[in-house]
Amino acid sequence: MNKALFFCELLRMRRSLATQLLLVFALLVSFYSVWSGSAWQMAQQNSLDQYVETVEEKSSEWRADLTAIENGEGESSPYTARPMDIQLPAVHKTGATSHMAIGMTEIMPARLVISPRRNGMSMIAPYEFDNPMTLLFGRMDFVFFVTIIAPLLLIALNFDVIASDRAQGLSKMLLSNPVTETTVIANRMIARSSILIFIVLLALIFGLTVADNLTFSDAASWVTLVLAYLFFWIGLIFLIVSQSQRGFSGLSKLVSLWLLFALIIPAASNSITTYLFPQPSKLELLSDARSATSEATKQTAELTQRFLEDHPELTIGDDQVPGYYRALFLSNSVVRESTQPIVKDFSESMKDREDMLDILQYLSPTTILQRSLIAIAQTDSRSHSLFLETAGQYLSNINNVVEDSVLTSNRISVDTFDQIKIFDEIWEATQKPSVSIFSPIAFMVFLGLVLIGFTRKNSKS
């Protein structure tokens, strides 16, 4: 690095009002992105906490009624403390950096009602989508800033790093000194880009410091991925501005490449994966569920008799208990069995799409960074799919606990209820999808080095 050129460029930047405004804009937007994501996550977490509190309050009341019945304290109706009325909450807890990478959290269900009354499709608690325009363009979080806005800021700072001197004929006078044009461009870009990179890292470190339960590996992964991504863009800008004789020509090329990497390739990749691995028909899933529910309701007596023949040790309990409980439980079981093939198709289709996107992401460093960061934050499709799968298994376990009591019109004991684990414990013990960042980082750094090396080789020749 040529210190004279470097500090001279810093002095020029200090005297440039446009550059100062651009850097101030970068500072404000970068910190705003962290604040915006944190504010959204706080509101989301408050909503989930309130939901959990409401469901747990109902569960406590149900347990209190069951305890009173076991202790013979007062009379109870046939509807009181029935196992079909058990309600337990299940919420999707994301990673420590989810406030900087909202990902799929805005549009995927994050809270479920776990109850024998529900099946895999009806356990999703009602929730409200955000403003459609917000969902269309994406919420302002740090991932949006660093993947979409930061490259534009790098382009705005560096597109005329040498073109204006060439147009005014000043480059020849500058090159009369013992320096090459490539050296001039490199030092000027280092001076201009270093301040922006410092701002980005400052906002990133701020976002990491406000995270709860952040591990060193996650923090190091974020910093390394962001630096590798910015290094790629610096290499690309270095190549374009070195070959552009006019600033407008270089700017148009860089903006076109930004559109290609940030918008066109990600959209095309999603279209390709959707075409290759289409989702099964949701109408078919709903139709199968309705048919199964209808058939199970009609055959309640037959299904109950078949169950009792398989379990002769059980006897029918309180005759005052309405058959609706038994019918609902049996219909949910039939729905689960009849829709299992198409639900499996949904899961396999999602897995195939994600596996294909893991390959197609290497067409665009922007996609690489986005997918890597939201995967670390556990706000990606794989994490949400695992959440729904874990909740479905949790519901099946509860159904196994209450099945005998429901079908024989009896209650479960308080001890049996207390042995049911809460969903948070199960989710914490669940193995999360592994995230590999070595290949993404190595690929982006390799691209940056190739672009810089190609530019230097051309300048020497």
Q: What is each of the regions a protein language model found here?
A:
Residues 1-135, 251, 258-461:
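Transmembrane alpha-helical segments and their membrane-interface loop/helix boundaries
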Residues 4-6, 156-197, 458-461:
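Helix-loop-helix units of permease transmembrane domains in multi-pass membrane transporters
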Residues 18, 180, 215, 219, ...:
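Membrane-helix interface segments
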Residues 19-20, 152, 184, 249-251:
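Alpha-helical transmembrane segments and their helix-entry boundary regions
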Residues 30-40, 58, 133-134, 141, ...:
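Secretory targeting signals
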Residues 138-164, 168, 445-447, 451:
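Long, hydrophobic alpha-helical segments
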Residues 154-158, 202, 235-236, 252, ...:
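Hydrophobic/aromatic residues in alpha-helical transmembrane segments
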Residues 159-163, 207, 211, 237, ...:
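Membrane-water interface at transmembrane helix exits
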